[in-house]
Structures are given as C-alpha cells and as structure tokens.
Amino acid sequence: MLSPKKQKYRKAQKGRVASKAKAGTMIAFGEFGLKSLDSCRITSRQIEAARRAAVRCMKRQGKFWINIFPSIPVSKKPTEVRMGKGKGATEFFAARVAVGRILFELDGVSEGIAIKALELAGAKLPVRTKIVKRYE
C-alpha cells in the first residue's frame, strides 16, 4: 500500500476537499484514464484494491499509472474512549480527490480490455467515475 516515506508533521487537520480540481484534469501518460465525478477522500487501501483489480483484468500487459498519492495522515481514537486526552494515533493515509481529477491511466492494451479494467477499478472506489480517452 502507498504511504509517505517522510512527513513534515505527524498529524494533519481534517481539511476539506476542493470542489473542482485545479490540476491533473488531463491525461498525461496513457491512452485511457479514469476521471473522478465527485470529491472525496480515497484511502491507500482503496487505491491498492483498484490497482489490483485493473492489473488483474489487463493480465499484466500494458502499463498502469496511479496519478494520486495518499499523503494525508488520518488519525482515529479507539472506540469507547472519553473525550479529550489528545487526537489519537494515525490510522491510515488518504488522498483528497476533487471533481475532474484523473485517478488512473493505462496504455498498451486494446480498448475493450482498457474499459473493462477501468470499470473494475472504479467499482472499488468511493467516488463516481467516468472513463476518458486521450484527445476526446
């Protein structure tokens, strides 16, 4: 699973996800991409599950790019713990994804396989997605 090697701060504030993506809205590497239609926080586990589903469908042919990185530490307190006494330990890492952001790209496979792989990857994510083609 993806996680940052080094962090400037151990814990982060909750923050909000931007409504529209300012960058990363165009396909940069591959021929097909998976674009987000909602804004959401995606965990490293969800990214890994989507990657595995897509790569398995592609039968390890072609190339697959992940365009988002889970750099935000999300902390959580144990259940049935009283208020106060600190923020809680880091539970997982997440990436903030805005509307219009390209999440994954792939290349080197036929259009049918690419669409099927990206549909499987999109089913693993908590956002509505759409498959886009380069130059479309």
UniProtKB/Swiss-Prot annotation:
Part of the 50S ribosomal subunit. Gene3D superfamilies: Ribosomal protein L10e/L16 (3.90.1170.10). InterPro entries: Ribosomal_uL16, Ribosomal_uL16_bact-type, Ribosomal_uL16_CS, Ribosomal_uL16_dom, Ribosomal_uL16_sf. Binds 23S rRNA and is also seen to make contacts with the A and possibly P site tRNAs. The lineage of its organism: Bacteria, Pseudomonadati, Pseudomonadota, Alphaproteobacteria, Rickettsiales. Pfam families: Ribosomal_L16 (PF00252). The keyword Cell membrane does not apply. NCBIfam families: rplP_bact. It comes from the Bacteria. One of its GO terms (molecular function) is rRNA binding. HAMAP family: Ribosomal_uL16 (MF_01342). Belongs to the universal ribosomal protein uL16 family. GO terms for cellular component: cytosolic large ribosomal subunit. Keywords: Ribonucleoprotein, Ribosomal protein, RNA-binding, rRNA-binding, tRNA-binding. This is Large ribosomal subunit protein uL16. It comes from Orientia tsutsugamushi (strain Ikeda). One of its GO terms (biological process) is translation. The gene is rplP.
